[in-house]
Amino acid sequence: MQMPAMMSLLLVSVGLMEALQAQSHPITRRDLFSQEIQLDMALASFDDQYAGCAAAMTAALPDLNHTEFQANQVYADSWTLASSQWQERQARWPEWSLSPTRPSPPPLGFRDEHGVALLAYTANSPLHKEFNAAVREAGRSRAHYLHHFSFKTLHFLLTEALQLLGSGQRPPRCHQVFRGVHGLRFRPAGPRATVRLGGFASASLKHVAAQQFGEDTFFGIWTCLGAPIKGYSFFPGEEEVLIPPFETFQVINASRLAQGPARIYLRALGKHSTYNCEYIKDKKCKSGPCHLDNSAMGQSPLSAVWSLLLLLWFLVVRAFPDGPGLL
């Protein structure tokens, strides 16, 4: 086995051991879902990856954002709060750069509006709940997205931010994360079913942090498109990893005790989108053909090394089904 693969296996083992430690810390809770849904491919979710139209979307943001602020006061207030916080952090950057715990510098192409969007999403406000509820329905039709989805700017900026943060990560780029949900038990279609999480899904690198959000359903997830956003969150102690709505997963194990929580273990498969560049197509492609890059639309298989890591994780889950770190 090559040394990088061996080191990756070691890192996974260390991560699993850390998950078994019972360490607690204060955390601000954010309810993630408001209704019960089956865990499936979430076909009504709006899953645009903006392949081939990122520059055109960026150019359209000023007018689009102004219009959306007028339609949603919660969105406008959260964005204002996040903008203020981002400016404060930028002013403190010289001080942070001397600290051993300083955040990593943003990746190439990461702009201020990406940082503001992530801060707005993680703020202790109703925005993330309203936004994800809208994302889960905006893909029911192209017309519904164009005429009724009032978070086009936020969806684009979060999507592009995760793409940039993901491309800027050092290997390994996949992460073992945990996700706790309060007041809702998800029901997967069955073992080995292919599913998506339906919206922008918050998870944590720390098992204990995820528990604070609930245990009615508790996920163990291998994500390869989710990106750590600790340095762009109002609550860095959560060690949050944000997963985009177009990442696909395979259900490798699921259980539900009679009076206990549902436990679901997912491994990354790739990505799948029904939509691409819908806003730009509507605004600029009516008078003639558009040439957009659709390379990001389909499924992308995992590497052999990551498949081996996922197998190792599954074996640990099977060996310790009731371990406190794998709830």
From Swiss-Prot:
Chain sites annotated for binding NAD(+): Y121, R179, S233
Coiled coil region boundaries: none
Function text: Has ADP-ribosyltransferase activity toward GLP1R.
Native organism taxonomy: Eukaryota, Metazoa, Chordata, Craniata, Vertebrata
Active site residues according to the UniProt entry: R179, S202, E240
Name of the gene: ART1
Pfam families listed in its UniProt record: ART (PF01129)
Keywords: Disulfide bond, Glycoprotein, Glycosyltransferase, GPI-anchor, Lipoprotein, Membrane, NAD, NADP, Nucleotidyltransferase, Sarcoplasmic reticulum, Signal, Transferase
Protein name in UniProt: GPI-linked NAD(P)(+)--arginine ADP-ribosyltransferase 1
